[in-house]
Amino acid sequence: DLSQEDDRTRDRYGRNTWGQQLLMARRLIEAGVDVLTTSLRGPLCGRVQNWDDHAVTHHVFDALKFRARAYDQAVSALIEDIHERGLNERVLVVVTGEFGRTPKISYQPSTGEGNASAPAGTRQPGRDHWPRAYSNIWAGGGLETGRFIGATDARGEDSIERICGPGDFLATIYHHLGIDSANVRACERERYASQRLSENE
């Protein structure tokens, strides 16, 4: 019940769907929920209500401007709030998508008008799917924070330093949950081989 939160806290997260979603997430964590997933989608994303920023969907730069304030406010409020409440050892916050976006901007005719999209037929910039390099945000969970891990080449096309894959991503979460990733199996057939990120790296 978000009405139990004071106005200052609700304003801090943002009086919009994303802000109130992440405030609810914090409340559920305080109530004892161990694993929680929330998705920042819907009207705050733009015309098609997701982050699929192909040129036919969104004007990628307008879409980022359209989302940035609500995203930054909600995510930073959650991370700060977790630290201020002393939950930063117990709670691991991971903000990610499923892949990156092409470093090279593509141009295609827009398929429709609306938030973060040009009128139908107007050529607009976009970015397509790109699995070779992307980033995520990690906070809390007892991790050493305030740093970057890894790097891409100058064009942002490929990871060139401290390359981590999905196995590393999952193994780090498993480690936080007290699960030995060496014993995790996918589909009960193949061993899910990965190493967690070292606590000191």
Model-derived features: positions:
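Ligand-binding pockets and gating/stacking loops
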Residues: 1-201
